[in-house]
C-alpha cells in the first residue's frame, strides 16, 4: 500500500446480499473475511472507515408488508438483521487485527454500544473502524438512507456503495447486454433518470449535504483500496 489515498474518511455501504456469497441466504464467512481484508487495506492507507451493512441476506421488512403484514414490525426485524451482519463483520475484522466497534441505532447494551454521533467520530479519530447497525433506527427508511445519514454525521469525504456491478449502468447489465456504464453523474441526473443505485431519499440526502457517492464492485479483491487511490472501475456521483 504505497499510493496516496484521495479521501481521509469514508463511509462504506455494503448490501446484506453481498455477505451471502453463493449460498442464497445468510452469511458466507469467507465473504465477510474478504470484505474485512479490503477494509484492512483501506486502513493501511490511513483512511478512516465507517461501514453500514444491509440485512437483505437475512430479512427484508418490505417482504412482510407485501404479504399484508405490519411494515413497522417488518422493518424492525430487518434492523435486527443488520445487527447480525454487523457483528459478523466485526468478528472478521478482529480476526485480522483490525480494531472495530459496532454502534447500533437500536439500544441493545448487552450486544453492542448505542449510536451517538460524538462517540462515532471519536472512535474514528482513534483509528477504529465503526460499523453502524440498526439502520436509522426508524421504520420506512432503507439502509441506503442510513448510509447517507451516517456519512453526513461523520462528515465523510465520500460514500462508497459496494454493489454487484462496477458502477451505475443505463440498465441492468445482467439483463441488458447493451447497458452502458456511466463514468460520472450528478446527484440530480441520478434522481431524474431514476437510476437504480440507491433509493431517492438517500441520493437526495447526499446531494443536500454535498456528499460524493462512488459506486463500485464489492466483489473485486482489493477493489476498495483501488477506489480510495483513484483507481479501479466505478461511477462517481458528484455535483462538483
Swiss-Prot record:
Entry binding sites for UMP: 55, 75, 136-143
Predominant location: cytoplasm
UniProt EC number: 2.7.4.22
GO molecular function: ATP binding; UMP kinase activity
Region listing for Involved in allosteric activation by GTP, in residue ranges: 21-26
Activity regulation field: Allosterically activated by GTP. Inhibited by UTP.
EC primary class: transferase
SUPFAM superfamilies: Carbamate kinase-like
Pfam families, alphabetized: AA_kinase
Record protein name field: Uridylate kinase
Localization (cell): Cytoplasm
Residues annotated to bind ATP: 13-16, 56, 60, 163-164, 169, 172
Protein source organism: Brucella melitensis biotype 1 (strain ATCC 23456 / CCUG 17765 / NCTC 10094 / 16M)
SUBUNIT field: Homohexamer.
Classification of source organism: Bacteria, Pseudomonadati, Pseudomonadota, Alphaproteobacteria, Hyphomicrobiales
Amino acid at each position: 500500500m504505497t499510493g496516496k489515498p484521495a479521501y481521509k474518511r469514508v463511509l462504506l455501504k455494503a448490501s446484506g446480499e453481498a455477505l451471502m456469497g453463493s449460498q442464497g441466504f445468510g452469511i458466507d464467512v469467507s465473504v465477510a473475511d474478504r470484505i474485512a481484508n479490503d477494509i484492512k487495506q483501506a486502513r493501511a492507507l490511513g483512511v478512516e472507515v465507517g461501514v453500514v451493512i444491509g440485512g437483505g441476506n437475512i430479512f427484508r421488512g418490505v417482504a412482510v408488508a407485501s404479504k399484508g403484514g405490519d411494515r413497522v414490525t417488518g422493518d424492525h426485524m430487518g434492523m435486527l438483521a443488520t445487527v447480525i451482519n454487523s457483528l459478523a463483520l466485526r468478528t472478521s475484522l478482529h480476526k485480522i487485527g483490525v480494531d472495530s466497534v459496532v454502534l447500533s441505532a437500536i439500544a441493545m447494551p448487552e450486544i453492542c454500544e448505542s449510536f451517538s454521533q460524538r462517540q462515532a467520530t471519536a472512535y474514528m479519530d482513534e483509528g477504529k473502524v465503526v460499523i453502524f447497525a440498526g439502520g436509522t433506527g426508524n421504520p420506512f427508511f432503507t439502509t441506503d438512507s442510513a448510509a447517507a445519514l451516517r456519512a453526513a454525521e461523520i462528515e465523510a469525504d465520500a460514500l462508497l456503495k459496494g454493489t454487484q456491478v462496477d458502477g451505475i449502468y443505463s440498465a441492468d447489465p445482467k439483463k441488458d447486454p447493451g447497458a452502458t456504464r456511466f463514468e460520472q453523474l450528478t446527484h440530480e441526473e441520478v434522481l431524474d433518470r431514476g437510476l437504480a443505485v440507491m433509493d431517492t431519499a438517500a441520493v437526495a440526502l447526499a446531494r443536500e449535504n454535498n456528499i460524493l457517492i462512488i459506486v463500485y464492485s464489492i466483489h473485486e479483491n482489493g477493489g476498495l483500496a483501488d477506489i480510495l487511490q483513484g483507481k479501479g472501475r466505478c461511477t462517481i456521483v458528484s455535483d462538483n
